[in-house]
Every structure is written in structure tokens, then in C-alpha cells.
């Protein structure tokens, strides 16, 4: 039987240094080595969220890490989720349920922080009682000293957990010595003793040229460098932050089915399109350029954290009109969640759930109307797509109800296992749904691509098997470049 390991926290010198991916790697490594790991991030800020089996909401990154760990996701893995709804305001989701909107000043004030701290501590304690080890992820930089008193997620959380902290730094962006040394030295002495190792991430070139740098960092900081992990391009793990959209295709291609995702300002759950991005039959691109939209065979309207605001922008910049024109000229248009709402006759928000806009006309492609409501629907679903007999899976996360207009027939896109119906189907070129993850189902993708048979030179692939292969590749990559015996020693040391 394996020993109990201390919790392991992957903290960072800054944002986007690779904490989430390294945490996923260790979740898979511990699983491969016979442990029963689980991920944990006390507070996450992201638009990409996921519905747990209990119908509650967590950050998508922790759902991915749970998948790497081979366990079902749970709200205890991410008890506090912030979903930005504007540049200054976020929806606060506590233990999987929204508790209201807060601006940054209100959220980081000391009043109320201790109640939130108790909640995230309790979530960790429940998780630690069930799993060994807990793989924790910090947020942003560990040395934001102006926010020290209100920090719920970095060193204060590690101290509560009794975690060993590995500091992750991104050498690719430059300044790694200053960022590592500065991060360590800005910590209080009682915090600093929890830093047990440094991991240099995203290294390019010959690692032998950095051997002297490793020694310098160890001498400066007084802790070992537990690994130098090279940059990779051939491992595909779901990404958490929409900043990664900057690396995606932005133009139509040739020789494949051109699928355009409309680039909304408040786009959420862009992971809905991961399968299409890997499908060899498809050229997926993200755009709000009207000329590029006209080249698309299929246009996908994604989810939005602020549907009315995005609808206003689409009408203002001409994208709404371009989508309607493209559909009239033969393009398939499909909306998911907020995108489904956008496709209807109108979107109404009389109770100001989203903001000040009370009503806007939609694109008019679907004979439905949406009314925003304060209660959020969050659940995993099983369903049949149209009349197909295959059982599909997905999840719902939305605020608002969408209903057909009074003078049109009921024409659902999906028949849910609990007897409910979802979405609206006009014909195979025009449809909408509330189900995120609908495009993870092969039968749905095959249906969308079937009219473009002249472009289909490749075959589809098994996405679930593909993801498992990628987790194993990631684990092998990290295992090769870290001192795993040293890390196990750290996690079992009684000092």
C-alpha cells in the first residue's frame, strides 16, 4: 500500500506560467504510480466552467485535472469560482452555486473574506479525507503582497493544508531569475519554509546550457530546482484561459470543411470546439471578420457570459448581418447556449440579470424568444440528437429560458433522458441548443459535416481515447524532466 503523501501545491511566479498543466501532469503521474489523487484550486477566475455530476459548477481546469486523475469532478475541487461579466465585475460561484455579482474592490475587501476562507478550507479538508495526495494549484503570482491579507488561494491555503509548494516559473518569457528570487524573497519567513522546490517550465534549447543557472537559483533561494521541463508542441490538453485563443486560426482554409466560431467579446466555454479543432476533416477558425465569415461552411455561435452585451456588439459591427447573409447563401448556423439565445427573435432582460440592456432583437434565425432569469441552470445531461438512437452526453450552464414563439410548432434539437426537450431545429442548416459539449459527440459532428461530403477526405477520431493518450504523453514528458524521487521524498518528509 502506498504511503500517505503531503498535499502538493503548484504555485507560480505569475499568471500563465503553466501551473494548470503541470498540476494535471502530476495528477496523472500519481494515478500511474498507484495513488488516488485529486486536484484542488481554492479560487479560480475563468469563463470556462463545467457542470459536475451533481449539477453544480466548477472551473474547467479542475474538471480537466480530475479527468487526468481518473476521478469524477466535484465542487470541493474548486469551491470558489469567479466568472468575469465585465472589466470590473464578476459573478461569484461558491460551492457550485452563484451567490451574486461583485466588483473587484468589494470582493477583495476584508469584510466577508473570512467566511469565504472558512468555506474553501472546509472544501479542502473534505477532499483531503478522500484522496491521497491532493494536487493543489495556486493562482497568478504568489507574491502579490498588496493582496496578502485577502489571499485565499496561494501560501495561506498551502499553510492551512500543510502542503509542500513547488514554485513554477516560465523561462520562455524571460527574467526567470528575478521572478523566482523575487517571488521567494517577498514571502514572509513562515510562508517561505513551505517552498520546497522550483520547477522551470517552457524551456527551449539545450538544457545543458542552463545547468549553471540551476545551481545559481538553488544558491540564491536555498531550495532545490526539482526539474526543467521543455516547451512542447505535440501534446494537447484543454486550455483554461481565453488568452490562448490568440494562438488559434483566424482565417478560412482550403481543402477541408471551414468551420467559423464567432469571436464574441464575452465568449465562454470555448472548450466546446476542442473536438472540431482536432478533427482532420475540419479547418476551425475564430473570427469576427465579416469577410472571413462569408467563407465558412458552418458558423458556430458560442456561449457568452454577457449575451445582450455581445448581441449589441454584433449588431453594431455588422457581424450579425454577415451571419444572416451567410446563412441565406447556404452556410449552416448553429448556436450553443448564449449563441442559441442570440439566434432567436429577441433577448429580454427585464430584471437586469446581466446588466442595463432590457431588450434587443436577435438574429431572427430561430423562431424563439429568450428571457434572462436570476436562477442558474447547471446540470450534466444525456440525450438523443434529433432522431438518432445514439446516447449523447453534455452539460448545461445558463441563466435564462428560451421558448418557441406562439405561432410556431415545437421542434426540439435534443431529447433529454429525463423527458425534457432542448433547443430548436429549423432544418440541418439552422439549429440551437443549451447543451455544452454537444460537439464532443461523434454522431452530432458527422451530421453537421455530412452535407460537405466532397471535402471529407479524412475520417473522424475517438476523442476520449485521444484525451487519455495526451494525459499519458504529458505525464511522460514531465516525469522525464523532473526529479521524481526527490519530489516523493519531499512529500513524505516529516520535517
Curated annotation (Swiss-Prot):
Source organism of this protein record: Bacteroides fragilis (strain ATCC 25285 / DSM 2151 / CCUG 4856 / JCM 11019 / LMG 10263 / NCTC 9343 / Onslow / VPI 2553 / EN-2)
Residue positions of the active site: 337 (nucleophile), 436
Residue intervals of the GATase cobBQ-type domain: 256-444
Entries under InterPro entries matching the protein: Class_I_gatase-like, CobQ/CobB/MinD/ParA_Nub-bd_dom, CobQ_GATase1, CobQ_N, CobQ_synth, GATase_3, P-loop_NTPase
Function according to Swiss-Prot or TrEMBL: Catalyzes amidations at positions B, D, E, and G on adenosylcobyrinic A,C-diamide. NH(2) groups are provided by glutamine, and one molecule of ATP is hydrogenolyzed for each amidation.
Record-linked SUPFAM superfamilies: Class I glutamine amidotransferase-like, P-loop containing nucleoside triphosphate hydrolases
This protein's encoding gene: cobQ
Family note: Belongs to the CobB/CobQ family. CobQ subfamily.
Cited Pfam families: CbiA (PF01656), GATase_3 (PF07685)
Protein's recorded name: Cobyric acid synthase
